[in-house]
Amino acid sequence: MMRLWRRLTALVLALLLTLSVGAAGTTGFSDVPESHWAAQSIQRCAQYGLLQGVGGGKFGLGRTMTRAAYATALCRLMGWELVTPEKGSFTDNQDTAKWYYSAIETAYAHGALTGESRQCRPNDAITREEMAKMTVRALGLAVLSGTAADDCPFSDVSVAQGYVALAYRMGIIKGVSAYNFEPKKEATREQAAAVLLRTYDRLHAAIKVTET
């Protein structure tokens, strides 16, 4: 197991050499009180340009995060240049005029989204296990998911054990209790912000280590 985590660290550090995220000005939302548990994550995600509000000065607190919105945020986090092919890779991503078209195609090109199904379900709410899987795949760590599956601490995860285990061990995502993850539960926008911010912080903390 120690060899697995050494490989994980090495792969992440290698990835970081090309990672960059631009920062924007500080942003506040009228529906996010300063006392909210995710207030700092939301504010910093907006500041770094990872997430935007839903309009009218609101973040959309409590709303579910769509798969398209999360894929878009990952593209921004990873600094991927958007691609816009003439034909989409999924049956439900064929309209090039859709705001998420290029992000879906870019996430697919980088392996964050898979072609296992002919549909990407862009407007569906992303589940907690899908969020873990998409994030780990965006980091280029899918190769470790098979080995990591036996290290998953949550008894209610059966489909994406390796991805959840990796995301958990990296400190990117948390369980709802010591042994429960609620993998099929839909993630809210603030929960997605927390995962994105933790990913950002872990990556940039590792960058600082390699530079010293």
What do the predicted segments below correspond to?
Residues 2-39, 52-101, 109-132, 137-162, ...:
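Feature responds to low-complexity, polar/acidic, surface-exposed segments characteristic
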Residues 165:
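Hydrophobic alpha-helical
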Residues 168-170:
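GST-like fold's C-terminal all-alpha helical module
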